[in-house]
């Protein structure tokens, strides 16, 4: 929005030309989202406390979690608000990729909001009925997937980028829709499963978003895309603004979510952030890269799948509790140790993922 205004004002003062620089807008997008979230934090927390929107804790969870009961939840509202406002201010409104991310972000945020509302108001730990949650998540994912397929079929926008192989980029055809669906829905749920400890989900999200900001910049630059042997996508550059907004909003939220947390993001935050990372990976054609950089989310999800599968097939559990971060808690690891070690692993995976762009 401000970019368009600056384009009209540049004729009166050349200094407004700085708004056309992607790097400048990326930095101010991060700072805008950061300051909004820091400003909203105390106010939202106080309001949630006034409404008694406190966290509902499972009775079969680790005993250390019982002290979290009543901590304000639905803090994801401040994350979403910060991201949306920052993106609308600093990204080109005419860019379709930006609107795809906002559509999934807000859509999944709405699903998460309803889920959280049922938990905190009706005191129902299950929240929104699972089939309805997946119905709405699937509808949102399929809507954007079909739209992208119709507008991009037969172009690099629907190719599959395979790590380590620079000349292997097959056209997916209609399978693009299926892949996009699983990536968006899967990532939304993966981040949701990871959000079980103070700050555990938000920092990996920030790191992955930061990694995708670099990838988006390279993908939207013809010279760098050619150098890295990845598809050049002319709309991809503006995703840098979206990614840096996620980083800024995430860091602002972490200020209040770090151990011991003053607020939890709730499903309104985790589903939205996961869906956003998923659609960003789809738009950049970097689904495999998401698996690497978001390895913490992948492992958390696999631990649940393996735990449920093992119990149903063998009547035995693999882990003391799933997702796997609870397993380490029950082994006696202090919560901060689990959190920081997962952060370190996430940072390593993001760096490894970025390195694969060159190893081709």
From Swiss-Prot:
UniProt cross-references to CDD domains, sorted A to Z: GT_MraY
Domain of life: Bacteria
Single GO term (MF): metal ion binding
Keywords: Cell cycle, Cell division, Cell inner membrane, Cell membrane, Cell shape, Cell wall biogenesis/degradation, Magnesium, Membrane, Metal-binding, Peptidoglycan synthesis, Transferase, Transmembrane, Transmembrane helix
Principal location class: membrane
One example of a Gene Ontology biological process annotation: peptidoglycan biosynthetic process
Ubl conjugation recorded as keyword: no
Iron among keywords: no
Similarity comment: family membership: Belongs to the glycosyltransferase 4 family. MraY subfamily.
Known function: Catalyzes the initial step of the lipid cycle reactions in the biosynthesis of the cell wall peptidoglycan: transfers peptidoglycan precursor phospho-MurNAc-pentapeptide from UDP-MurNAc-pentapeptide onto the lipid carrier undecaprenyl phosphate, yielding undecaprenyl-pyrophosphoryl-MurNAc-pentapeptide, known as lipid I.
Name of the molecule in the record: Phospho-N-acetylmuramoyl-pentapeptide-transferase
Organism field: Cronobacter sakazakii (strain ATCC BAA-894)
Higher taxonomy: Bacteria, Pseudomonadati, Pseudomonadota, Gammaproteobacteria, Enterobacterales
């Amino acid at each position: 929005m401000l970019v368009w205004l600056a384009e009209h004002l540049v004729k009166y003062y050349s200094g407004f030309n700085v708004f056309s620089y992607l790097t400048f807008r990326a930095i101010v997008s991060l700072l805008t989202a950061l300051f909004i979230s820091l400003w909203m934090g105390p106010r939202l927390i106080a309001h949630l406390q006034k409404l008694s929107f406190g966290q509902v804790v499972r009775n079969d969870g680790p005993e250390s979690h019982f002290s979290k009961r009543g901590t304000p939840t639905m803090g994801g509202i401040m994350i979403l608000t910060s991201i949306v406002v920052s993106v609308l201010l600093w990204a080109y409104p005419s860019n379709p990729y930006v609107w795809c991310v906002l559509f999934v972000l807000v859509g999944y945020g709405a699903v998460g909001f309803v889920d959280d509302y049922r938990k905190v108001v009706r005191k129902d730990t299950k929240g929104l009925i699972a089939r309805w949650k997946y119905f709405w998540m699937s509808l949102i994912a399929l809507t954007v997937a079909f739209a992208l397929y119709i507008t991009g079929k037969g172009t690099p926008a629907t190719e599959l980028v395979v790590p380590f192989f620079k000349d292997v980029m097959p056209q997916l055809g209609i399978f693009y829709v299926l892949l996009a669906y699983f990536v968006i829905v899967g990532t939304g749920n993966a981040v949701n499963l990871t959000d079980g400890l103070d700050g555990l989900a938000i920092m990996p999200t920030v790191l992955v978003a930061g990694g995708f900001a670099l990838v988006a910049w390279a993908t939207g630059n013809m010279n760098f895309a050619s150098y890295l042997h990845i598809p050049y996508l002319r709309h991809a550059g503006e995703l840098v603004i979206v990614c840096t907004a996620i980083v800024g909003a995430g860091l602002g939220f972490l200020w209040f979510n770090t151990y011991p947390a003053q607020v939890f993001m709730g499903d309104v935050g985790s589903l939205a952030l996961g869906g956003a990372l998923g659609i960003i990976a789809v738009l950049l054609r970097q689904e495999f890269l998401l698996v690497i950089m978001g390895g913490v989310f992948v492992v958390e999800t696999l631990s649940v799948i393996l735990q449920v599968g093992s119990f149903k097939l063998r009547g035995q559990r693999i882990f003391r509790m799933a997702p796997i971060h609870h397993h380490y808690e029950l082994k006696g690891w202090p919560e901060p140790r689990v959190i920081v070690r997962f952060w370190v692993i996430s940072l390593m995976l993001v760096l490894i993922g970025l390195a694969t762009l060159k190893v081709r």
